[in-house]
């Protein structure tokens, strides 16, 4: 043949690039609204809020599909090592939510008898399927300066614009 390996490699890579080059007709598959917002056995839409005294209580809600009949939340004082911790388990109040897209179960728990000014770790699930551990800090019994970020309901362009608002707010929020 008399062709060098260097020339062969150059020709081969050039021809290969023709096979993998993008074309104008390619479009990403758009996921339907029904599929995109379908609940599953995995908890999602986890929302932490206060219900009473922020030094000693905290409430959490989350969504699952309707096959999950009972929800639970586990909570414990967060430790520095991140290793196992002693947790208390709370049974959720489960409510059926009907919408034009799909039905879901919403689960709600209020953690009580918490220690003031303490960092807690919590997770939610059905006893088999759990979220990761999330953290919050209870308020102090004495008035102290604090900051918070308030978000309204964006409704539209959540991925393209609203996610940037979240990142910017967390970056600029004083601690």
Q: What is the predicted role of each segment?
A:
Residues 14-21:
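Hydrophobic h-region of N-terminal signal peptides that target proteins for export
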Residues 1-4:
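Short, Lys/Arg-enriched N-terminal segments with co-localized hydrophobic residues
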Residues 26-175:
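Divalent metal-dependent phosphoesterase catalytic cores across multiple superfamilies
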Residues 7, 21-24, 106:
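A composition-driven signal for long, intrinsically disordered, charge-rich low-complexity tracts
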Residues 6-13:
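Sec-dependent signal peptide recognition
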């Amino acid at each position: 043949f008399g062709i060098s390996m260097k020339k062969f490699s150059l020709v081969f890579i050039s021809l290969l690039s023709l096979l993998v080059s993008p074309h104008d007709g390619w479009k990403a598959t758009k996921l339907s609204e029904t599929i995109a917002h379908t609940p599953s056995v995995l908890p999602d839409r986890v929302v932490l809020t206060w219900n009473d005294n922020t030094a000693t209580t905290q409430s959490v809600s989350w969504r699952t599909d309707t096959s999950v009949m009972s929800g639970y939340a586990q909570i414990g004082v967060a430790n520095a090592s991140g290793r196992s911790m002693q947790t208390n388990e709370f049974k959720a109040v489960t409510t059926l939510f009907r919408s034009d897209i799909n039905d879901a179960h919403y689960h709600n728990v209020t953690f009580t008898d918490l220690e003031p000014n303490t960092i807690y770790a919590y997770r939610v699930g059905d006893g088999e399927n759990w979220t990761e551990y999330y953290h919050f800090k209870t308020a102090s019994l004495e008035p102290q300066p604090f900051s918070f970020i308030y978000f309204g309901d964006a409704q539209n362009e959540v991925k393209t614009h609203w996610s940037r608002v979240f990142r910017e707010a967390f970056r600029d929020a004083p601690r």
